[in-house]
Every structure is written in C-alpha cells, then in structure tokens.
Amino acid sequence: VRNRYWTLADEPVTGWPQQDTFVLKEGAVPVPALGQALTRTIYVSLDPYQLYYQRERTGPEGAPCHARTVSQIIESRMDGFAAGDFVFNTNGWTEYALMGEGVWRPGYMVPRKLDASVGRISQAVGVLGMLGLTAYAGMNLMASPQPNEIVVVSAASGGVGQIAGQLAKQRGARVIGIAGRDAKCKFVTDDLGFDACVSHLSPTLSADLAAVCQPGIDVYFENVGGKVFEAVLPLFNQAARMTICGLIAHYGDEDGGVDRRAALMKRGEPIFKTRDVRVMNLSVSEFAGQHEEMLAYLAPLVKAGKVKYREDIRQGLETIPTAFAEMLRGDSFGKMLVQVSPDPTLGARGPGKSRQGPFGTVA
C-alpha cells in the first residue's frame, strides 16, 4: 500500500489557488513510533482559513496541506487510542498519516476519539466540531441575541453561517440570512428556518436587506465583508453587536485580506461610534475550552432535528484542490468535505468515482 497526498508547489501562494498551486505526490505509508498512531483519513474538511496556512506555509516543509480530518486508527502505539477507533485529527490532504508524539499540529486541534452514537462522524469537522464551536462562541457567547432582536448572518448557507443563524432562532431572535443563488436562499428559509434571506447577487442588495430588517439590525454575524458589509452598515441599531468571524470576500486579494479587518473598522467607525456598536473579533482557538459545553448544547439539538446541517461531500482524494477552490469562490452548497476512504459507520460505503479537477498537478 502506498500513500498519496497533496502538497504545495514551490511557488508562493498568492490570490486564489491556481492550477499549479498543489502537487499530488506518492510515498510510503508511515510507521508509528512509540506514542504515535497510524490513521487512515476518511473525511477531509475544507475551510477558508486553510488558505492562510498555505500562504504562510505553516507546518513542515513538503508535508501534506493542512486540514482537519476524521480518520480511523489502523495501528496504535499511543496510550488511550486503539486500532479501529474513529478520531478527529489533522491529517491534512492525505490518505494516511501519523498522529501523536512529535507530529506537528495546530496547538488547539487536539486529537480526540469520536462516538458514532452522538452523530455522524463527518460532523466532527462540522456542526459538532470547530464550525459548531465557531458559531456557538460567536453567536451565543459573544453576540448573545435576545428574543425579538433582528439578527443578520452573511454566508448563511455555509458551514458556520447555517449553524449561527439557527442558534439565534433558538434564542427567539428574528433571523435574516444573506446568501448567493436562489437555491441557497430557499434552503436558508425553507430548511433552516430563517425568517428571510436576501441574495448578495441582487443588484438591489442594500434595498432588499433594508426591507426585511425593519427597524434595523441588532446583531450581525460577519463572514463575508465587501459589499455585504456595506449593505449592513447603515442598518445598525443603537447598541448593536457585530461578531467578525471571517471576510471571505477578501481572501482572494493578493495580500490575503490581512489588513481588511482594520480597513473594515475604519470604514465603519463613524456609525460604530455614534450608534455605540460593539465590534468583536472571533478567534475560535480562544474558545477551545468550551468545546464540551458546545457539544452538550448543540448535539441534542442536531439529533432532535432542531438544528439542521447540510454537507457538500465530494468524492476522492483527486478532487480536493478543485473542491477547495470551489469552496473559496462560494460555489459549494453547505459544509465542504471530501471523502477519501470508506466510512465504516455508513456500511463501509467508499468514495465514488474520482475525477481529476482543473486545480493541481501530479508529480
């Protein structure tokens, strides 16, 4: 058995991913040392923050591109983990990887065993994982919407947005989504239960949003920036709150949008000051200690169908770069995942036919 994985090409990563950004390589399956476990990747989570890791070349040189993953242990020499266990870990864009002692990972992304009875194991990198924690922290712990307040969520059909809006509904707020094409807006209202949804593709976005946000916005969960923020800005009520989760509209900028939060603050400063708007930057790593609290709150809601969650699952390791680019462009529909090996909890159903997309080259 050989191991295939995607790594970065030698050229610096700027702007959006290009055809030659990633290279598919093949090597030996690693052997676990004492304190390590060998795992087979089942699901790879694709998220906007990974583009920053790629630009900064975070992690070991030549290693697989970073990603959060759901995996199964093949061989363990690591206390507390046994062969057959399902785990959350950070294998990245690869079929096999080690976890444990001496294996690089972001500090707060600690490997943990998964209980398949709590929810689908894929949810460990979605609604019951970092995305769920992001939504829970940003909405419940930071913005804290109250009954009958008006809450607006941008990228409302995305991995974080769909959860954040439903959490606000659970608290009795009136929730307005901002999404893209009509099918996404329909999903946000009909399936997720938002009170209304407007399209950022509309030439009358500002007027559309104002019409459904009377008498103004009390909470804004920001995932986008750009023209969406411009439409929201004049609608803030007195003492409103804004949680800045992401600014995906700027991730394709040559500088990666690194100064966009400062620019956004400067653009909004006159209204923020006169209307006493509280602006909060969300960094999910600061809430790692609330993971179990989030699970205790959110898992029962998901299991009971009170919080719904859509995944966009692509099939096969070869599709990862293309799926990643589509996610960044907003062409995905729900939380973007790639399944690279069979999920035994679903009757060992393996990934479907792979296709080589337009992004990435084979070494």
Stretch-by-stretch model annotation:
Residues 28-46, 52-93:
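Glycine-rich beta-strand-centered segment in the early N-terminal region that forms part
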Residues 67-72, 83-155, 197, 306:
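NAD(P)H dinucleotide-binding glycine-rich loop of Rossmann-like/cofactor-binding domains
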Residues 86, 150, 174, 240-242, ...:
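Short glycine-centered segments of the SAM/dcSAM-binding site in methyltransferase folds
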Residues 125-203, 207:
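Mid-domain Rossmann-like dinucleotide-binding core that forms the NAD(H)/NADP(H) cofactor-binding site
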Residues 212-219:
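A glycine-rich helix->loop->beta "capping" turn
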Residues 227-307, 341-363:
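Glycine-rich phosphate-binding loop and adjacent beta-alpha segment
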Residues 329-334:
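Glycine/proline-rich active-site loop of Rossmann-fold NAD(P)-dependent oxidoreductases
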